[in-house]
Amino acid sequence: MKALVLPEPGKFEIREVPTPVPGPQEVLCRIRAVAICGSDPEIIRGGLAGTWPPSYPFIPGHEWAGEVVEAGEGVWDFKAGDRVAGQAHKGCGYCRNCLSGRYNLCENYGRPETGHRHYGFVSPGAYAQYNVYSIKSITPIPAGVSFREGALVDSAGVALHGLELSGVTTGGTVAVIGPGPIGLVTVKLAKTMGAARVIMVGRGARLKASKKFGADLLVDIEKEEPVESVRRYTDGLGVDEAFECSGAAGTFHQAVRMARKGGRVSLLGVPPGSLMEPLPFKYIVHNEIAIFGSRANPNVSGKVIHLLSSGQLKGKDLITHVFPLTEFDQALDTFVNRKDGAIKVLIEPNGPEES
């Protein structure tokens, strides 16, 4: 099979590699669509080498959808031909966090001998024609949800998990920092969950695109001071919830300052590993600002698929570009440099879905 392989940090190439064989409680899947995530360029560059990935050569990619080709031993609820969407995390299943449903925080992270998997980060990923997955990391998708839309389940789940952690005040005002794919979905779902107003903070074409997803007010960071503008839009009070979806320097501090007294801040964006910021501790304490770190998307894939199938979340609005695996270099360049209004850029390792 063909796969995108990282032979060493900073390099990638399309290679012929052996098709993997599913083990117990695993399925072999044909990858029909895989989306480029913001973490992928960093993994490819090698900025996290030694952790993501732990060694080379390595196949990245974790936001995918496809179909089951072969079921391993002990699999009875999936069969060849089933359409599925994947998520990156699969916990060991027996540590305290896994037993409480927080498998995204598995105590045995990075130890495959315990059963832990983090596909596309630590375990082989989806930039390939086929890959093997635990049945605990896949969710069925109905015929009404395309493979391309199914490849959005993982990233949309990140937004939903962050929203569920902090909650959304019915009739309240929300600020979202960062109009990338996760931020845009956060806008849409915040309105779905009852927010009366959503303020999007960002820049460029993606900021303008957030109107399509339900943003009521836009704050352009290239033209105005974000905290002052959000405060002005809320009569000086601040927002009920602020969602940081960019991971950029300075935005955590901004999110805290945007929150009203008793407000909540949810951190969805993944900052660079070296990023350190001074925090307004006195402000946080005196105003009882609740802060939530939000990692990945545990236990929400089924909900996201229902949102897609019902039309409440329109995946097609996020997908701007689609490339074959052989044009990954062009796809990556389009994504990283936001060319031609790029939002979500997809790869189809096995060609386009039949209409």
Task: Report each predicted region and the residues it spans.
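Cysteine-cluster motifs in flexible loop/terminal segments that predominantly coordinate metals
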Residues: C37, Q87-I138
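Glycine-rich cofactor phosphate-binding loops and adjacent beta1-alpha1 units
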Residues: S166-V168, K208-I289, E353-S355
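C-terminal hydrophobic helical "lid"/dimerization subdomain
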Residues: M1-A3, H253-R257, P298-S355
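Residue-level recognition of short, solvent-exposed, well-ordered loop/turn junctions
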Residues: G23, K79-A80, T169, R260, ...
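Mid-domain Rossmann-like dinucleotide-binding core that forms the NAD(H)/NADP(H) cofactor-binding site
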Residues: K136, P142-E224, E228
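Glycine-rich beta-strand-centered segment in the early N-terminal region that forms part
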Residues: P18-V34, L48-L99, P142-G144
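Rossmann-fold dehydrogenase core element
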Residues: G263-R264, P278-L318
